[in-house]
Amino acid sequence: MRVLLALLLSAGPALAEPAIPRFVEEPGPDSTYAGGWEYMVGGGAASFDCDADGFADLLLAGGEAPARFLRNRSAQGGPLDFAAEPSGLELTAVTGAYPLDVDSDGVMDLALLRVGETVLMRGLGGCRFARANEDWGFDGGDAWTTAFAATWEVGADWPTLALGTYIDRTQEDFPWGSCTENRLYRPAGKGFAAPLPLTPSYCALSMLFTDWNRSGQPALRVSNDREYYKGGQEQLWHLAPGETPRLYTEAEGWARLRIWGMGIASQDLTGDGYPEYFLTSMADNKLQSLAATDAPLLPRYDDIAFARGATAHRPPEGGDLRPSTAWHPEFADVNNDGLSDLFIAKGNVSEMPDFAMEDPNNLLLQRPDGSFREAAAEAGVASLVTARGAALADFNMDGLLDLVVVNRNAPAQLWRNAGGATGHWIGVRPRQPGPNPDAVGGWLELRQGERIARREITVGGGHAGARLAGCTWGSAPGRKRSCG
């Protein structure tokens, strides 16, 4: 599936080194991801437009505190202005949230991940929401839920959902080896069938449906926390319509990988048409690229993080040289030069002495040769507060991506992208008639001269949250472009 849009732009000369955007911290939302050990993970941010004004609104996980909905009242090109309003989303025990138009009625719904029952919230319009588990036949369980992904399988009117869970919270004294069952929910009529187990389950902290081989058939990537599993690894699930999910095996090319898997971000960085995957961990971040793209295509990946300057394994600033702890990763073009950059939210789990306590966020700007340059401090987003989830979105509709970061046991932070030496941009909101109006699972392509940049439209990944709204593409200078 491709979403089609064509346009031509022009700009000035290209630069060998990426332009540094200037982020201005603005009064942050009155929201804190609060709590004890059950909230050491999670803390997601969901960005979506729930009142059809084109401006992205926010829901921030609150942990033991109620989740906080923030309506976007910003003026175009002006300071960022969010107001907390009652929405029906103010549940406690929320670890994360993902936007999705579940029933394809044109009004955004949300999945609220919780320590306890996961709740699907139906959008009523005007940024009001109501519980829909019973109406949609959705069994939200009672687990410590930390990961979510959604897609539309071929021919389906309703989405397929995946829930990833963490450890058995009744085993606080000895949680190792207590990973609970992940679940797959397929549609049945105007709702969902009983969930299918995705076992073995290894304490998932991020999930992503992705068409890794461009076959038109999504698979499910699962990133798992090695701290608590026994005999586990990263996972990739076959998801053939009507068939029981099954894991890719070593015989099919899948190599065993064990990391403290926290988050997933995907983007075609090499221009070969296939997505690369950035996996966050504790000092062991990976940037995976297909080892070979000739037939038969196998899910065998090389780690290109070191070669690309994207290991982000220790703090780039300050005197704390202990390893970093990475959470939410997100690819986006923050300086509008036509190249995907990478933001990584950082923060110690909970006073772990072997890892950095002063652990600033990363902002890796991509160079024209495909390597990355650290720029968080210069750009103004190298906060030392303990971060978890985040979202990059154009909150004031000026063509520049702004940033919100959810912090653990500290207030969330908000930055406005004030530009600097930035290029032109293209704003795109994919829409299609019928089921799946946001074209989840589709691909956007931006042609710039002989180069084609590709972006898969996904719901999932990151760490405990994601955005689903219009997207902004930077426009590389000096060439004709088309987006389709």
PLM features per residue range, with description:
Residues F55-G62, V107-R114, P159-Y166, M207, ...:
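Hydrophobic beta-strand segments that make up the repeating blades of beta-propeller
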Residues A19-W37, A83-T92, A132-W144, A194-C203, ...:
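Short loop/turn motifs that recur once per blade in beta-propeller domains
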Residues L163-T180, S223-G231, I344-E358:
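Short, conserved, GDST-rich strand-edge loop motifs in beta-rich repeat architectures
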Residues E25-G63:
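Beta-strand-rich domains and repeat architectures in extracellular enzymes and scaffolds
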Residues G42-A52, R71, V94-S104, M108, ...:
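Beta-propeller blade termini
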Residues T180-A188, E234-A240, P360-Q366:
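Beta-propeller blade signature
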Residues V94-G96, V115-E153, D168-P175, C179-E181, ...:
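Asp-box/WD-like beta-propeller blade repeats and closely related beta-sheet repeat scaffolds
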Residues E17-G35, A156-L161, T165, E243-P245, ...:
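Gly/Ser/Thr/Pro-enriched helix-cap/hinge segments flanking short amphipathic alpha-helices
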